[in-house]
Structures are given as structure tokens and as C-alpha cells.
Regions:
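N-terminal signal-anchor module of multipass membrane proteins
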Residues: 2-51, 114-120
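Cytosolic juxtamembrane amphipathic/interface segments immediately preceding
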Residues: 7-19, 153-157, 238-245, 313-316
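Membrane-interface segments at the starts/ends of alpha-helical transmembrane spans
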Residues: 14-19, 110-125, 198-210, 243, ...
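Long, contiguous internal "core" modules enriched in hydrophobic/ aromatic residues
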Residues: 25, 84-93, 98-107, 208-210, ...
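Hydrophobic alpha-helical membrane-insertion segments
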Residues: 30-37, 165-182, 329-338
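Transmembrane-helix bundle segments that line or gate the permeation/cavity pathway
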Residues: 41-60, 129-238, 255
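Low-complexity, proline/glycine-enriched hydrophobic segments characteristic of transmembrane helices
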Residues: 42-120
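Alpha-helical transmembrane segments and their immediate interhelical/interface regions
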Residues: 120-152, 284-306
Length: 341
């Protein structure tokens, strides 16, 4: 540790996007934007069709049950002079009309018609952001736990997971944007208090204020730790010595503990609470397993890609075997937790 891990040539190695790769990336982004627009258009068209069909169903129900309305009108006219009798008959007519209209199967009447096209688009953005957050957090945990374990083999590929968790600030911006449309996604916000006994028992935890505060704390600490580990890692390579290593060791040890708590609560807040009526005692571990499996797969793909482009020549077959072992292990662990779930 008295000297730098890499040669000066390796320290100055920088990945540069070729024009071909840049065009592919821009092309994929363009295709993604087009698909989003097409999906929004189709969802909007589907909503309009649903509204039309709902109106037709309502008309058909009235046409198929004219007796109900006739009886209601006759009873109302016959009992016009007797208030109590008219009210009773009118109540029976309303009850019969509700049964004919199918309130129970209609999702509670006219107040709820399912997700709109706007909700679908926002949910797609929300889930996409979640996907990349889990990969970035898997990479951050990978660096921290290997620093705590003083593992030397990952030094050769450390810059790749560091680049992966560099996405966290952008993910935080996406998370902040998600706060603006929480009422379009989370059922525990959509359903008013007092209408669902089970959700009411969870409102001490599941409430917008607590959700936002926890999210800000989690992302703030994660980004701070990521930036500190990245900076200390760079200094360690350029300056050598043990000072920066020991600092990163202490930070990593504390972060591993914080990660276990914060990431479990994050999984409950951002994923599990989408279905507030569902119970799980291992969902945090299940999410962690999937996050690590995805991060290891992404890390392996990126390292192999960089080697094919002529970078990271110091990465050998032993490193590749370690990647494969990690990916296999966490995939099995994820599958085991899925079966247990």
C-alpha cells in the first residue's frame, strides 16, 4: 500500500465513446422516446375507448331494465301524498337500480375507473428509475463490502462500479420528480383515510411526509458516501500510502450497517408499498439479492465490453471467474429468496 496500485499509463487511461457507439446510444435514446410517445398515445386511446364503452354499458343497463325506472316513477307518483311511504318505495327503487348497474363489480361506482394514460406513463418513469437505482446501489455496496473485507482482487476493476454508482445523483433527481405525482401511483395516498381499515393501520408509517423525509435522508447519505469513497479511491491511486485507505475503510464499515437498514426501508417505501395490502417479512433481503445479481451482471458486461475495446488489459481470466462466481451466487440467492417469498 506504500505505492500506487497502477502504473502512470493505467492511471491516465480514459474511456472515450467512439462515433459508432455514440450513434448507437443516440439511436437507442431516440427509439426509447418514440416508444414512450407511442405507448402514451395507445394508453390515451385505450382510456377514450373505455369511457365510450362505459357509457354504452350504462345505456344498455337502463334499456335492459326499464321496469326498474317505471316502477320507481309509478311509486313516486302514487305515494306523492304520503312522504314516508314514498321515501321507502324510492329507496327500494334506488337499491334495485344500483344492483342492475353493478356497483359492486364496477369498482365502487363512478369514482374510480382504473389508471389513466398519464398514470401509466408516470409509473413507467417511476419503475425505470427504480431499476437503475437498484443497480447503482448494488455497485456501491460491492465497493464498500470489499473495502471492509480488504479484498485486493477488485482493485483492477474498481473504476467500473464507481462509475455505476455515479448514477445516484441523477436517480435522486428522478426521485424528487416522483414526489410530484405520488398521488397518481401509491394506493395509500389515493384512498382517503377511513375507507380502508388495513391501510389506516399503516398510516403512521405510510404517509407522504414520512416517505419524502426518509427518501431525502437515504439518497443524501448514499450520494455523500459514494462521492467520498470515489474521492478517497482516486487519492489512494495517485498518492499512495495508507491514509486514504484507512479513511475509506472506516466509511465503508459504517455504510454497510446503514445500507442494511436504509435499503430495506427503501424497498418497503418505493416498491412494497405499491401494494399496501400485501405482507412480506423478507422483502428487503429479496430486493437486495436482486439488486446484487443485476449489479454483478451489469459489471460483468461492462468489463467485458471495455476489454474488447482495448481497455483494462490488466484484467485477466481470474477476475472474469470471480465475476461469474458472484453472479451465479447472487442469482441462486435471489431465486432462493423468491421461492421463500
Amino acid at each position: 500500500m506504500a505505492s500506487s496500485h497502477f502504473t502512470p499509463e493505467q492511471l491516465t487511461e480514459r474511456f472515450e465513446l467512439s462515433s459508432r457507439i455514440r450513434n448507437i446510444v443516440y439511436g437507442l435514446v431516440g427509439v426509447g422516446v418514440i416508444l414512450v410517445l407511442i405507448g402514451a398515445f395507445l394508453a390515451q386511446s385505450g382510456d377514450g375507448h373505455h369511457d365510450d364503452s362505459h357509457g354504452e354499458e350504462h345505456a344498455e343497463l337502463i334499456t335492459e331494465n326499464p321496469t326498474i325506472h317505471t316502477v320507481a316513477n309509478d311509486q313516486h307518483e302514487d305515494g306523492h301524498g304520503e312522504d314516508s311511504h314514498a321515501d321507502e318505495d324510492h329507496g327500494h327503487a334506488d337499491s334495485a337500480h344500483s344492483e342492475a348497474h353493478g356497483d359492486d363489480g364496477h369498482g365502487g361506482g363512478h369514482g374510480h375507473h382504473g389508471p389513466t394514460w398519464v398514470t401509466r406513463v408516470l409509473t413507467g418513469f417511476y419503475m425505470s428509475n427504480l431499476y437503475f437505482i437498484t443497480i447503482a446501489m448494488g455497485a456501491l455496496f460491492f465497493i464498500a463490502v470489499h473495502r471492509v473485507g480488504n479484498a485486493g482482487w477488485q482493485t483492477a476493476i474498481r473504476r467500473v462500479p464507481e462509475a455505476m454508482f455515479g448514477w445516484l445523483p441523477f436517480a435522486a433527481v428522478g426521485a424528487l420528480a416522483s414526489f410530484l405525482f405520488m398521488d397518481q401511483i401509491f394506493e395509500w395516498i389515493i384512498i382517503p383515510e377511513g375507507q380502508d381499515a388495513l391501510i389506516d393501520t399503516k398510516r403512521a408509517y405510510l404517509n407522504p411526509t414520512g416517505f419524502i423525509i426518509r427518501s431525502i435522508i437515504f439518497f443524501g447519505v448514499w450520494i455523500l458516501v459514494a462521492r467520498m469513497l470515489r474521492r478517497l479511491s482516486t487519492r489512494e491511486d495517485t498518492l499512495g500510502g495508507l491514509q486514504n485507505f484507512e479513511k475509506s475503510l472506516g466509511i465503508s464499515a459504517g455504510f454497510v450497517v446503514f445500507f442494511a437498514i436504509s435499503y430495506s426501508l427503501f424497498a418497503i417505501d418505493w416498491i412494497k408499498s405499491l401494494e399496501p395490502h400485501w405482507f412480506s417479512t423478507i422483502f428487503g433481503v429479496y430486493t437486495f439479492a436482486g439488486s446484487m445479481a443485476s449489479a454483478m451482471a451489469t459489471l460483468t458486461i461492462l468489463v467485458y465490453f471495455l476489454r474488447r475495446q482495448g481497455y483494462m488489459k490488466y484484467v485477466n481470466d481470474s477476475h472474469a471467474q470471480d465475476f461469474n462466481t458472484y453472479m451465479l451466487g447472487f442469482s441462486i440467492f435471489w431465486a432462493y429468496m423468491w421461492v421463500s417469498q
